Amino acid sequence: MALGITIEEAPRLFAIEVAGDLDLGSIPGLHDALQKATLTTCPDVALDLDGLTSIDDAALGILHGALRRLNRVGRRIWIVCNLTALIDRLERAGILDSAEVAASRHDIASH
């Protein structure tokens, strides 16, 4: 399945919704979306991964670096995910050292 990316920008939240397979071949699209997030004035960035069907190790590494860059420019990173196996994989990869997990974008708004 090809990767689909949707971006929504509100005053306080820049949201990137990802659906499909995230692998080395599809990472440029996500990289572009994350680059836009570094340029926004929104304090919070949400990366919604509930629509992912797979993610490979190369994509995890690139994602980890991108999230660290967002932290360096002062963005608070949220991973929206309800898939326990994916959350565990993100934790093992060290990605959650740079982000917080939320069940929904609505949960982010309440923080």
Per-range role (PLM):
Residues 1-111:
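STAS-like cytosolic regulatory interaction modules
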